[in-house]
Regions:
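ABC transporter nucleotide-binding domains
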Residues: 1-218, 229, 291-292, 297-325
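Charged, flexible cofactor/metal-binding loops and thiol motifs
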Residues: 211-319
């Protein structure tokens, strides 16, 4: 079984790459492989020009200062038996970055940066709300001045109003500290708000990658189009006229994935004898926009009938070996 299979992408310094897809598509597994919390069974992970795939624990130690992670559940990701000061300071102490007084001062500065009272240094996690706990998680990730932060659905467990606060905080911190984010989510509105580029995954594969505005205005892969058609829009009249594309069935099991294109059992544009026989490469369209589909969407939006019919036949777009920036 391969939870993540043959994906290739790059992230530029200072940008935010949004990663979307249904539950079980491999987003979190990919994040843990990037962080070397899981060891990939093939391929390689390159960070800042260095292959870190097979580095030992001792060799990874200095690199771990430069890449941190914000976890999904603010209730489970903080040790309930430890005070906030200890939680945020742990990375500083592991890497021996300062005296006790300097560490305490740094932690209090970080709490203030993320919008919490520095005097709450000695409180326990249960004394904070969900949004405040996630701010503590952000402070912990910032403690050692990393270059890259992998955000694994950091707002999915929060109320909508609190989600906006955390997203705005992450954007402000990126501007202030020059951070690079890999931002994983299943909410397309959240991803649109924070991302520079968006990568869509399905059953362990990358099916589309493009600049944010381009992927929302001109999706090429039918799966991306189906996801976008389900996003609520604030115009009631337009919402009544639009008919979401309903995908039949559930995501297949990665233990026994479909042949060729993994989306073909649910795809409205499925062509028997092609989609189930030949796996589509990542076709390159323009401006770094790539999509893995033999019969891509010609324009957007489409009617339900147009969505199910490819008028141009198989794509003549150039295939690319990997999803490049």
């Amino acid at each position: 079984m391969q939870a993540v299979d043959g994906i290739s992408f790059s992230v530029k310094a200072g940008e935010t790459l949004g990663v979307v897809g249904e539950s079980g598509c491999g987003k979190s597994t990919m994040a843990r492989c990037i962080m070397r919390l899981l060891d990939p069974t093939g391929g390689k992970v390159v960070f800042d020009g260095r292959d870190i795939t097979n580095l030992s624990r001792a060799q990874m130690r200095p690199i771990r200062r430069e890449m941190m992670m914000i976890f999904q559940d603010p209730y489970a990701s903080l040790n309930a038996r430890k005070r906030v000061g200890f939680i945020v300071a742990e990375a500083l102490e592991v890497h021996k970055l300062g005296t006790d007084a300097e560490v305490k001062r740094r932690v209090q500065e970080l709490l203030e940066v993320v919008g919490l009272n520095p005097e709450h240094y000695n409180r326990f996690p249960h004394e904070f709300s969900g949004g405040q706990r996630q701010r503590i998680g952000v402070a912990r990730a910032l403690a050692v001045n990393p270059k890259l932060i992998v955000c694994d659905e950091p707002v999915s467990a929060l109320d909508v109003s609190v989600q906006a606060q955390i997203l705005n905080l992450l954007k402000d911190l990126q501007e202030d500290f020059g951070l690079t984010y890999v931002f994983i989510a299943h909410d397309l509105n959240v991803v649109r708000h924070i991302s520079d580029r968006v990568m869509v995954m399905y059953l362990g594969k990358v099916v589309e990658l493009a600049e944010r505005d381009r992927i929302y205005a001109e999706p090429k892969h039918p799966y991306t189009g189906a996801l976008l058609s389900a996003v609520p829009i604030p115009n009631p009249e337009a919402g009544r006229l639009r008919k979401p594309v309903v995908l039949e069935g559930d995501v297949p099991s990665p233990i026994n994935p479909p042949s060729a294109c993994r989306f073909h059992p649910r795809c409205p544009r499925f062509h028997e004898g092609h989609c189930d026989v030949e796996e589509p490469p990542l076709y390159s369209f323009s401006n770094g926009h790539v999509a893995a589909c033999h019969y891509p969407l010609e324009r957007w939006p489409l009617t339900a009938e147009e969505f199910r019919t490819s008028r141009d036949g198989p794509t003549k777009a150039k295939a690319t070996a990997e999803a490049e920036a």
